[in-house]
Regions:
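Conserved pre-ATP/AMP-binding loop-to-beta segment of ANL
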Residues: 1-15, 22, 45-50
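Short Gly/Pro-enriched turn/cap motifs at secondary-structure boundaries
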Residues: 2-4, 182-191, 214-215, 245, ...
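Glycine-centered tight turns that cap/initiate beta-strands
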Residues: 9, 123, 148, 301-304
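Conserved ATP-binding/catalytic segment of the ANL
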Residues: 16, 206, 211-283, 289, ...
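Conserved AMP-binding/adenylation subdomain of ANL enzymes
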Residues: 34-51, 56-98, 113
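Gly/Ser/Thr-rich phosphate-binding loop
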Residues: 68, 98-101, 111-183, 196, ...
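C-terminal boundary motif of the adenylate-forming
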Residues: 209-211, 259-261, 298-325
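Short, conserved charged micro-motifs
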Residues: 327-330
Length: 330
């Protein structure tokens, strides 16, 4: 027997990853989950009867509401980069999987395997990946392993509001990828309807309310904020963090501050530049990790990089940490 619930009743407390701070419990109400199901269906064309490979367990919780069958692969979901791709391919082929939600690390493993072994997964028509920027070469490898009408989607959002925006492999032109490599940031696509997304002036302080004068024009980098049906309103028993993460417009509408720096381009596409808290504040202005690191990550022999700031904010010196390919300990 289903319990009779009301839209504003608390349905769950979902914790943030804690990758950039202390994990916080996000209060989800029934209306948030209902809106997420509707937005996922409409944004990605998910239909009842599909089969999902659950490499990311939290997304699998949506499968019954979306009418999808769940296939659980043999892997450690907390360490997606260590997944055995042969097991993933076997599960996809055995159960005719149509949908896969995986981290960028898992897609890199699976895409590389399919490329090296010339494997095509004819039933896999949709791949979703979130949690971090997905490299262009990873998207290309996965696209090659899918049927011609298959698409790789990279939704952008957070536990507090998901999905916020999305871009698919069909829209990832060579020009966009080149822009990322040249330091423009990562294009995360158009806002997912009916979300409203804006760019707020950068500040580390609480913003109780904002007006038009606090919003930035096209091309200017600020903090990404969003208001929509999946925008949650509080953290569990964390009043101070809630105050920092939420704001209201002149009409009293609630908005969530993503804590991410970004901007809109002339085509209305949203670009991610990096975490606001990880920006390097120099005497000449701010530097954003995703923009800077992408330039150096494209250099042959470089595995990954990390931009950090040394010194007091406003006078920091930028330092780039570089990890090279195939470094072996001796």
């Amino acid at each position: 027997v289903l319990v009779d619930t009301r839209p504003d009743e608390t349905a769950a407390i979902l914790f943030t990853s804690g990758s950039t701070g202390i994990p916080k419990g996000v209060v989800y109400r029934h209306r948030h989950f209902a809106a997420q199901v509707d937005m996922l269906k409409n944004a990605f064309g998910i239909r009842p009867g599909e089969v999902d490979l659950a490499t990311f367990p939290p997304f699998a919780l949506f499968d019954p509401a979306l009418g999808m069958t769940t296939v659980v692969p043999y892997m450690d979901p907390t360490r997606p980069a260590t997944a055995n791709p042969t097991y993933l391919v076997q599960a996809i082929e055995q159960f005719s999987v149509t949908n896969l939600f995986g981290s960028p690390a898992l897609l890199k493993v699976l895409g590389k395997y399919c490329t090296e072994h010339a494997r095509v997964l004819p039933t896999l028509k949709r791949v979703l990946s979130a949690g971090a920027a997905v490299p262009g070469d990873t998207i290309a490898m996965m696209q090659k392993a899918m049927p011609k009408d298959g698409l790789v989607h990279t939704p952008y959002g957070a536990t507090e509001c998901l999905p916020l925006a999305c871009i698919s492999s069909a829209d990832m032109s060579p020009e966009l990828l080149a822009a990322t490599r040249s330091g423009k940031g990562t294009c995360v696509g158009q806002p997912v309807a009916p979300n409203r997304v804006a760019i707020l002036r950068l500040t580390d302080e609480a913003v109780e309310t904002f007006g038009p004068e606090d919003l930035l024009a096209t091309g200017a980098i600020g903090e990404i904020i969003v208001s929509g049906p999946t925008t949650t309103d509080s953290y569990w028993q964390r009043t101070a963090q809630t105050r920092l993460a939420k704001t209201r417009d002149p009409d009293g509408q609630l908005w969530h501050r993503m804590g991410d720096a970004g901007y809109f381009d002339a085509q209305g596409r949203l670009w991610f530049c990096g975490r606001k808290s990880q920006r390097v504040q120099t005497a000449l202005g701010d530097l954003f990790a995703d923009q800077i690191e992408a330039v150096f990550n494209g250099i042959e022999g470089v595995e990954r990089t990390a931009l950090v700031g040394v010194g007091a904010p406003g006078q920091q010196e930028p330092v780039l940490c570089i990890e090279l390919h195939n470094i072996k300990s001796t």
